[in-house]
Amino acid sequence: MLGETTMAIQEKGSVRALALVGPTSAGKTALMEALLHVTGAADRRGEVGDTSPEAKARGHSVELNLAGFDFMGDRYVVVDCPGSLEFCAELDAALPAVDLAVVVAEPDPAKAVLLQPTLRELERLGVPHALFINKMDQARGSLQGLLEALAPVSSAPLVARQIPTWDGDKVSGFIDLALERCFVYRPGRPSEQVDIPGDLADAEAQARFHMLEQIADFDDALLEQLLTDVTPSRDAVFADLVREMNEGLIAPVFFGSAQNGFGVRRLLKALRHETPPPARAAARLAISQGAYVLKTAYAGQSGKLAYARVFGAALADGAEFVLADGQRRRAGGLFSVQGAALKKIAQAPVGDICAIGKVEEALAGQVLSTSGEPQSVTAAARPRRPLFAVALVARNRNDDVRLSGALSKLVEEDPGLFLTHDAEARQVLLAGQGEGHVRLALERLKRRYGVEIDTREPKTPYRETLRQAVTQRARHKKQSGGHGQFADVTIEARPLPRGSGFVFVSKIVGGAVPRQWIPAVEDGVRDGLARGLSGYPVTDVEVTLLDGQTHSVDSSEMAFRTAGRLAIEEAMKAAGTILLEPIEKLVVYSPSPAASNVTSALTARRGQILGLGPREDWRGWERIEAYLPQSERQDLIAELRGLTQGLGAFEADFDHMSELHGRLAEDVGRLAREGA
C-alpha cells in the first residue's frame, strides 16, 4: 500500500468535506447513499438523501443534502448538490468551502456537454475535483470513446485511473492503473482482487503509460524517467497524482455503479489518500478561524439554523461569534446533520459541517468569526440574476401579513430567489432561476406556512410618447361663492428622442404666470403625463410654458396645477400618442449544436440578432447577442432550456424603448384601459 509521504495527510481530528456535483439523474444522491451504506453510516439506501416532499415529487435533488460517515478511522461529510441549473444557487456558497468535488457523470458520450457548467465553476473557484463515471454496469461503448467526448468540456486533462474489464458486453471489474491491480465486482460485497487477465496486459500497459505521460507534463523528473525508460516508483506516481489534482492541474477519472455498490470502496480509498485537508479550503477562502455558512434554513421549532463548516479550531456550543459588521452573537445550539436528522452536540471538530442555532443575522457565504475579529471570504460567489418571475396575490387577503414574512424567509434561505415590489404595477414579484424554481418556492410557501397563492404574469412597463408637436391652451375656472379658482396656461408639447425623459421649460415673461406658480404648472403637467391615452405613463416629452393669465383673487398654486394637468391632457388628445415597449439586450449562452435553434426562437419572439460567436473559454459553446422585447422574455428560459438539454442561460438588461405597432399596440392599449 501507500507510504505516508504519498497521502494527503489528514489533520488530527479534522473532518474532510466532499461535494457530489453533476447533472440531474447522473446518480449523485445514489452515490451518497452508497457511500453511507458501504461505510455503515446507513443501514439501507434511501434513509438520508432527498427526503423533502418537493424532492420526492420531482425525483431529484432540489436542495443541499448533508450527511457524514467514517472510513478507515477518518471522518467525512458529504454535500449532495442539486444538478438542475434551476436549483444551482444552492451551490454558490457551498462549493468554495469543500475540500474536493466528485463530479458524477453517466457513461454516455452524448451527455458529456452536461458537465461543462459544473466543471467551469469548479475551475473558477479553484476547487480540486475528480470524475466518477456512474452506471458503468449499463455502459456499452468504450471508456476511451467516453473520455474523448469528455475531454473538450474540461480545461484540465482528464486522467483515467482505471480501465474496465468485461464479461461479454458488460463491465465486470476494473484495473487500477496506479496500483497495477485488477478487481472483479462482487454484488453486495467488496470487489475481489484477481490477476490481470493476460489478454488485457497490453491494454493495461498502454493505459498506464498514457496516465504517466499526462502527469509527467507537470513533473520534469517523471518526464525524464519516462524518456530514459526508468520505471518510476509507485510512491512517486501517487505523490504526483495527489499534488496535481489538488493544484487543479488534472482531473482523475474513476468509474463504477452507485446503485450496485461497484467501485465505491475503491473510490473511497482514493479519496482518503488524495482529498486535501480543511486547511486548504480555509486558505482558499482566507478564513483563519470561524464557521463559514453554506446555507440557512428555518426549521420549525428550532428556528433559524445556519449550516456552516468549521475552520481553524473546534467549535463549541455557546461560542461567541463576531459577524461581518462587528456585532457579537452566541451560538444557541449546535447540531450534527445527517440528512433531515439533527442531533445536539457539544462541539464540532475542524472541517465538520454542523447546524448552528439562533444566529439570526447569519447568511450564506458569510463567516461567523471566532478569532475575535470580523472576517469576510475572498472567494465570493458571483451574484445570480433572475430569469423567471411571477406576480403574487394571496388567495386569502387575511394572509397578506403572513405572506410577507414567509416570503422573506424563503428568499433568505435561497440566494437564487428575489422578492421585489413593483410600485408602478402594484405587484409583488417573486423571481428565480426558472419556472420550476419559482414553483418549488410556492409549494414550500404552502407546505411550511399554510399560505396559498394565485399567480399572474408580471406587467410590462409600457410607455407612451406624443406622436407630434402641439400647442394647447387650458383654462381652469371655478366659482362657488367666496374665493373661486382661476388659472389659464398655454403650453407647447413636443416629442423628444428616445431616452430623453421629461423636460419642462418656462418662457414666461412679464409675469403672465407669477414666478411662484410656475412650478405648480410643471407639477400639473407631470400629473397629466402619469397616464396617457392608452393608460401608460408618458415619456420623452418636452413641455414649454408659453403664456398664461392670472386673477388677483382667485388664482392659486392648486389652480395652476390643475390648469397644467388639463393642458397636457388636451395636448395628448390633439397630438395623439404612440405606444413604446421596453427592449432588453440579451446575452444568451448555448451549446453550439443548439445555437441555430436558439436564434430561431429569439427571432420568433420578435428578437433582433446582433451577433453570434464562440463563448470565451467555453469550447463548443456560442454567445448570442440580441435585442428582445421585455414582454417576450417571460417564459424564454423554459424554451431555451428545452432547446439546450437544460444548459442554456441568458443575461438581460434594459436597453431602450421602441415603438409598438399595429395589432400588438391595439391589444396592449385595450388591456390597459380594461384594467383601469
Language-model features, listed with the residues they occupy:
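Structural and coupling elements of P-loop NTPases
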Residues: L2-A676
